[in-house]
Every structure is written in C-alpha cells, then in structure tokens.
C-alpha cells in the first residue's frame, strides 16, 4: 500500500508581484527545485469554496476543515449572517434567554468580542445585530468589552472600527465601552495565562490603565507605537466590570482563541490564576465555543471526513504541528471532531515562548521536521504536517523575519523530501490560504492579513499529470486517488489527477 505525507505550508499563497512578497525575496532552493521537477497546480482557497462569503479571505480553520472534509462546509460567519438576514437571529432561544435573565434582574448585558474588519474570529455585523436585539427587548444597560485586532485587520484600524461601531450604538441610544484590550492578552491560545489574567482582571475587577474615552486610549497607544494587537488592558468606563446578576455574551465564533478567557469565567476547576466565583451571572456565546456555556448556534455534525475514513479502514495516521496549528491538523481537519482511534497519533510540538514570532521566525520547524522523520521510520500510512511559520510570522508584518521563516521551512522540506524518496512516501505539498506573499501595499503600508490568492499544490511524483486549477476541497480526493481507494460519498471535491 502507498504511504503519503501531506505537508501544509500555512499562509503560503501564489502571487507574481514582488513588492511585499516575502516568497520572492527568500532563497528557497529545495522548494524551487521540487516545483520545477514535479507536477504543480493552483488551488482556490477563499470565499465560497471554503464556506465563507464571496471575496472573504480564507483562514486556517475554515481551510483545514475544507481540506479534511473534501467539501465545502458552511462556516459560522456565513451561518450567522444568514440567520440575521432571515431574521431568525432575533428569535434565537439562547439569546432571548440571556436577555430575559438580564431584564428580570434589572442588570447589565456585557458583550465581549474581537472588534475587527477581518471577519475571521468575529463580525461587526454580529455585534450590531446582538445590540439591536437588546434594544428591541428593552435591555437598559449594555457594556462592550472590545478586544482589538491588528492581525486580521490593519494594525492601527481599531480606533476607526470602534468609532464607526459606537456611531451606530449611539443612534440606538444603547451601549457604553467598558474596557479595551488587545488580542495579545485576551485571545491567547498557547497557555500564556499571565496575559489572559490581565484581560480578565480588566473585565472583572476594572484593573488596568484608566482613560476618560476610547479615542484617548487608542491614540496614546498608537503614539507609543503600540498597535491594536498589543493594546494594554484599559478601563474606559469606571464601574463597568461584570457584577452579580449580570449577563455576558461572547461574540467570537471561533473557539481556539477565546477558550482560555472563557474558561476563567466558566470552568469550575480553573486554577491558572485567581478568579472571582460568581453566584448568579449568566453566560452565553453567539456560537458554540465552550462546553460550559450555551451557544446560540452550534457546529453541525460532519460525516465522511478523511480522518474518520482512514480510521475506519485501519490506516495508521500521524498528525504533526506546533502548538499554534495543532488544532488545525486535528480538530478542524476532522470536521470539528476530537477524533480518537488506536491508529491515530497526534504529535504536538511546542511553539517557542516569545512575545512575537518575528523574534524567532524559525519557530519550532526543526522539531516538527524531526517528528515527521520519526513518523516515516515508524511506517505511518498517512502523515499530515503543518508548518506554522509562513502564517504566524507574516502576521507580525516583519518582512525580513518572514524571509528567515520561509528559508527555515525550505531546509525542513529538503530533509523531508529526501527521506520520503528513500522510504517510498508520496510527498504532497500545499497550503491552506495566502498571507506571506502579500505583506506590503503599493503605498508602503504593512499588511498582516490573509489574502484571497490561490495556493500551490505539488505532488512529488512525475508519473502524475495534474489539472491546471482546482480548489482545496480537491486535495483529499486527489490523495484518495493516489491511494487507489474509493472516495467517501460525502466528498464533493474531485481528484486533480488527469487520467
């Protein structure tokens, strides 16, 4: 039976232009030779293909899910947008129960979420719809706890985003800003609970920098060259902290970066730092992101995923990634299932403990590579590996660091390619979405967001011929074709191999 390695270069898109293109600046001899020697095609990795609105850039979660499911899966952004459009959002039982609780207690509704134009973790339209519902239901007090972005939106766009949103809130005559905090603190996903504590303390105890208004807060941070991602936990309205009998709505719809903060509120066994034990506070989330609180909308059960299919066939699988992308090669690739099987081995390689990955752009690519080489020695049938560097370092906006990140990955690819040839593995190289290929605009502005560019697909076997174009939902049907096994009936993607 054939053995296959699927290698995902996270955030590696295709773009011909050289301005702000770290890929064009980097010396990538191994990848260049592979792309010249073996079949290559280009894949769509954004918008409707990955279950997002048309023109929306792909993200690692949606794209890994699309890859692993071999089909388009409606993403939370699209689902909730549609619910708002058809007005059923305003009749959602979870949201109405939370609002009834607030009204019955004559208390405050707190809304916590990322304020961003990126639509990756949250949507401003969802914020506004939730506020509109509160207005309709005559909630008397709403407090916003804004998490500023700077990664999936421009680094200093937060002030305008807040201003635009508050203009709408003021028209409704409802809502004040309680706290502002950068996602560096509130949306950690690598167990940096010292950061999370600062966000929590601002929201619960009103501990943080004090400002008289949000504009002063943002402008002072910008003046000190602190971008949205790193805004220090700041108090805008004194006395705006969560109190007994209040209600709390979390508005992020992606779980992995809000889970640590939520757990500080809802996990009875939480012990990472001292937390307040509320007796009568009601929590809910717009989307199901934590098992301890109700979500207004939940994940659909997805059948026919590649991981489950291989498990049922008895294939020995390895999933390998750094901490930053570990959920993507496991939970998201498996269609939001925590798949468990005696032949499935999940290998987490710790990401380096640094404030920003441009401080160590190599990240732990060497550790990931070592795990892949060991997996080949152990004769796994399918190895899925993700290199986080291109995406994570590109989010810092540091182009020289991105060049180093890419060159580190290229060395790793060389080692994997060589051993794959020796051990009779078919090596398939691709990406989930673009990012590192477009980091500077024509006017010189730094870009840290994902792109809608296509991504490469390379199969390191000259016997195959590939179609010129496809989508990332075609990746697994192609691998199924290489294995010479039947495709799960649920998959709508097609093989990229020309017969």
Language-model features: where?
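Feature captures the catalytic ectodomains and active-site-proximal regions of enzymes
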Residues: 1-499
């Amino acid at each position: 039976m054939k053995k296959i390695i699927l290698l995902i270069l996270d955030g590696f898109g295709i773009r011909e232009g050289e301005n702000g293109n770290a890929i064009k600046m980097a010396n990538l001899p191994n990848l260049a030779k592979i792309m010249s020697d073996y079949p290559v095609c280009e894949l769509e990795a954004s918008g409707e293909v990955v279950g997002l609105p048309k023109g929306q850039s792909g993200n690692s979660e949606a794209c890994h899910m699309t890859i692993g499911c071999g089909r388009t899966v409606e993403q939370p952004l699209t689902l909730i947008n549609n619910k708002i459009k058809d007005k059923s959002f305003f009749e959602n039982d979870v949201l109405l129960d939370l609002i009834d609780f607030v009204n019955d207690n004559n208390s405050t509704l707190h809304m916590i979420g990322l304020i961003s134009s990126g639509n990756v973790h949250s949507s401003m339209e969802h914020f506004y719809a939730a506020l509109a519902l509160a207005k309709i239901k005559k909630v008397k007090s709403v407090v916003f706890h804004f998490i500023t972005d700077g990664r999936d939106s421009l680094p200093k766009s937060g002030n305008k985003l807040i201003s635009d949103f508050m203009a709408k809130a003021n028209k409704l005559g409802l809502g004040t800003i309680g706290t502002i905090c950068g996602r560096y603190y509130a949306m950690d996903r690598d167990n940096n609970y010292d950061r999370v504590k600062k966000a929590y303390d601002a929201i619960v105890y009103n501990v943080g920098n004090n400002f008289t208004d949000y504009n002063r807060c943002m402008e002072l941070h910008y003046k000190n060259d602190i971008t949205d991602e790193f805004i220090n936990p700041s108090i805008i309205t004194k006395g705006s902290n969560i109190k007994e009998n209040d209600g709390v709505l979390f508005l992020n719809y992606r779980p992995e970066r809000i889970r640590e903060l939520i757990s500080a509120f809802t996990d009875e066994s939480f012990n990472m730092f001292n937390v307040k034990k509320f007796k009568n506070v009601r929590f809910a989330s717009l989307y199901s992101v934590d098992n301890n609180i109700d979500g207004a909308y939940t994940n659909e059960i997805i059948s026919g995923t590649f991981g489950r299919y291989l498990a049922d066939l008895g294939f020995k699988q390895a999933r390998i990634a750094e901490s930053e992308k570990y959920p993507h090669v496991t939970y998201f690739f498996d269609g939001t299932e925590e798949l468990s099987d005696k032949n499935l081995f999940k290998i987490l390689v710790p990401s380096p403990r640094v404030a920003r990955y441009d401080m160590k752009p190599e990240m732990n690519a060497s550790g990931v590579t070592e795990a892949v080489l060991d997996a080949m020695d152990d004769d796994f049938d399918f190895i899925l590996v993700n290199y986080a560097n291109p995406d994570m370092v590109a989010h810092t906006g540091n182009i020289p660091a991105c060049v180093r990140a890419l060159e580190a990955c290229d060395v790793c690819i060389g080692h994997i390619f060589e051993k794959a040839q020796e051990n009779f593995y078919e090596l398939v190289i691709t990406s989930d979405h673009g990012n590192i290929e477009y980091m500077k605009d024509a006017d010189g502005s730094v870009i840290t967001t994902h792109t809608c560019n296509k991504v490469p697909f390379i199969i390191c076997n000259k016997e195959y011929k590939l179609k010129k174009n496809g989508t990332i939902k075609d990746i697994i049907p192609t691998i199924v074709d290489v294995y010479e096994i039947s495709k799960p009936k649920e998959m709508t993607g097609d093989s990229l191999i020309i017969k």
